[in-house]
A protein has these predicted regions:
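A generic "binding-loop/recognition-motif" signal
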Residues: 24, 48, 115-116, 198-201
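Conserved N-terminal catalytic core of the sugar/cofactor nucleotidyltransferase
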Residues: 1-75, 86, 98-99, 173-174, ...
Length: 225
């Protein structure tokens, strides 16, 4: 599936890609070399000594990112029909506004409405304000008086773009941490926005028993596209 993600990123105009490796790191690196890195500038962030989770992986890879452009993060286990170019352009435009000292955004999270247990919470301007587990009733937010019933609830799609400025804030976190934990702290002082894609079709193929379903899902995407 890494080939599909790389090709989708390339079509979106991305020319530098950082790949986090842990399981089967050698095989992944060999595969990239055999394909001449698909003609792109592909750099490896080595996590073979231990998985750093979704936030720690970004922190470790920080020196490998281009220093002056929004960083597009894509979970390799996620299959979707999202237009990555459109999504990244939206993030880039908002970054440009921030540079010009206008209303800007520090991170953009791809979200959609779908049934799940865990939701991100947004205000009416789609600014991130918290997180909730609707099964347990747990709420996490930097705003103590937050009422989830007054918020917009959307599920995170595992694809997001963040400003390089936010990387400095990650120094406050341990080597291993989840990206949602980071955003929930950052949203108290930074503008973290949700990008709603109502027509989003998405599948998480992180488990072996989803491979057959993944083939059907990819075929469906080919037909609809």
């Amino acid at each position: 599936m890494i080939k599909r993600v790389i090709e989708n990123l390339a079509r979106a105009g991305v020319d530098r890609i950082v790949v986090n490796v842990h399981h089967f790191a050698g095989q992944i690196i060999d595969y990239l070399n055999e394909n001449n890195n698909f003609g792109l500038d592909i750099r490896i962030s080595d996590e073979t000594s231990g998985l750093l989770e979704t936030g720690g992986g970004i922190k470790k890879a920080a020196p490998l990112f281009a220093p002056d452009a929004p960083i597009l993060i894509h979970n390799v286990d996620i299959l979707s029909n999202v237009d990555l170019k459109k999504f990244y352009i939206a993030a880039s435009v908002r970054e440009e506004r921030r540079v010009k000292s206008e209303e800007g955004v520090d991170a953009v999270l791809l979200v959609s409405w779908r049934k799940t247990k865990r939701y991100l919470l947004f205000d009416d301007d789609m600014r991130l304000v918290g997180w909730t587990n609707i099964e347990t009733g747990e709420v996490r937010s930097p705003y103590p008086e937050l009422n989830p019933k007054e918020c917009r609830m959307y599920a995170f799609a595992g694809i997001h773009a963040l400003s390089p400025r936010l990387l400095k804030m990650m120094d406050q976190f341990p080597d291993r941490f989840g990206i949602i934990d980071f955003y929930l702290k950052a949203c108290a002082t930074h503008n973290i926005k949700g990008y709603v894609n109502d027509d989003l079709k998405l599948m998480d193929i992180g488990k072996l028993d989803t491979l057959a379903q993944a083939e059907e899902f990819l075929e469906e995407l080919r037909v609809t596209n």
